């Protein structure tokens, strides 16, 4: 039972992360810097406790994956700033799932049977339909897509980098807790570079506030590591993706966004389709 509670940490951590980041009027760059600082502090504590062996290869690969994360997370924050948590996060989660799936198929050749291909294609279609449905909005007597192509573009590009962040270590077979510290160093290095390149003053208060954003992300990341070790990739992966429920519904309720019954129907149906797609994908892992 306790391991399933640990498996819920990614659900809550990744679900509340974008909500926490947007509780205060911070720029995406400030959100990224605060998150990265907190992630590095958390990684240093874990390194001190666990003392994992870090090789030159694992350091370089994990450092690069951290850079990919920074670009992806910055764009995700920008996508949220241009829309809302409830609108951007289903797109982000869904397109990351599709991106990771395509990478697994094209690079790792994971779908070797006709059955696997059918299940995988159905899963991807369900996820994409679910993503679009969560963005529907009632205007008069009509239901229209409320998310602009501009926001879709930002979030999809974000998902491209976040997918690279996820698969880079897998590509070089770098696993375990040795990933966390060099990855966090890469995250912070890139975040500092992004803020320096912006050449505008940052708010220390905003950066400090977003240490909580980083803590939420770090706890989720640790929970995912622990759950995967015991439950396996398929189960822990499926559970963790429920973070889209927390982010979407939590974003609507906490930021007091008014939704009509019809809009709620589309949002909840879209989330359900995404989760069904996730379950189908987990069958292939």
UniProtKB/Swiss-Prot annotation:
Top-level taxon in the UniProt lineage: Bacteria
Keyword Transmembrane helix (UniProt): yes
Membrane topology: Multi-pass membrane protein
Protein name: Putative sugar uptake protein lmo0424
Protein keywords: Cell membrane, Membrane, Sugar transport, Transmembrane, Transmembrane helix, Transport
Annotated localization: Cell membrane
Protein family according to the UniProt entry: Belongs to the GRP transporter (TC 2.A.7.5) family.
Gene Ontology cellular component list: plasma membrane
Primary subcellular site in the record, as a coarse category: membrane
UniProt-listed SUPFAM superfamilies: Multidrug resistance efflux transporter EmrE
């Amino acid at each position: 039972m306790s391991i399933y509670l640990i498996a819920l940490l990614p659900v809550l951590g990744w679900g509340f992360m974008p909500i926490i980041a947007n509780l205060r009027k911070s720029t995406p760059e400030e959100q990224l810097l605060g998150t990265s600082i907190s992630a590095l502090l958390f990684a240093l504590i874990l390194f001190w406790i666990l003392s994992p062996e870090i090789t030159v290869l694992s350091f370089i690969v994990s450092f690069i994956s951290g850079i990919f994360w920074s670009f992806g997370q910055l764009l995700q924050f920008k996508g949220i700033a241009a829309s809302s948590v409830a609108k951007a996060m289903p797109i982000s989660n869904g397109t990351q799932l599709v991106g990771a799936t395509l990478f697994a198929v094209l690079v790792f050749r994971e779908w070797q049977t006709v059955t696997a291909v059918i299940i995988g294609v159905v899963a991807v279609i369900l996820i994409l339909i679910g993503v679009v449905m969560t963005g529907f909005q009632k205007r008069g007597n009509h239901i229209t897509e409320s998310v602009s192509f501009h926001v879709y573009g930002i979030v999809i590009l974000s998902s491209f980098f976040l997918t690279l962040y996820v698969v880079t270590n897998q590509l070089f077979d770098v696993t375990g807790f040795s990933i966390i510290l060099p990855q966090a160093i890469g995250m912070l290095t890139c975040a500092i570079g992004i803020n320096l390149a912006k050449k505008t003053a940052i708010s220390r208060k905003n950066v400090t506030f977003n240490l909580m954003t980083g803590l939420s992300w770090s706890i989720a990341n640790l929970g995912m590591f622990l759950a995967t070790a015991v439950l396996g990739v398929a189960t822990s992966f499926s559970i963790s993706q429920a973070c889209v429920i927390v982010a979407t519904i939590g974003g609507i309720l906490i930021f007091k966004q008014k939704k009509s019954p019809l809009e709620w129907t589309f949002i909840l149906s879209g989330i359900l389709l995404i989760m069904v797609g996730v379950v189908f994908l987990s069958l292939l892992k």
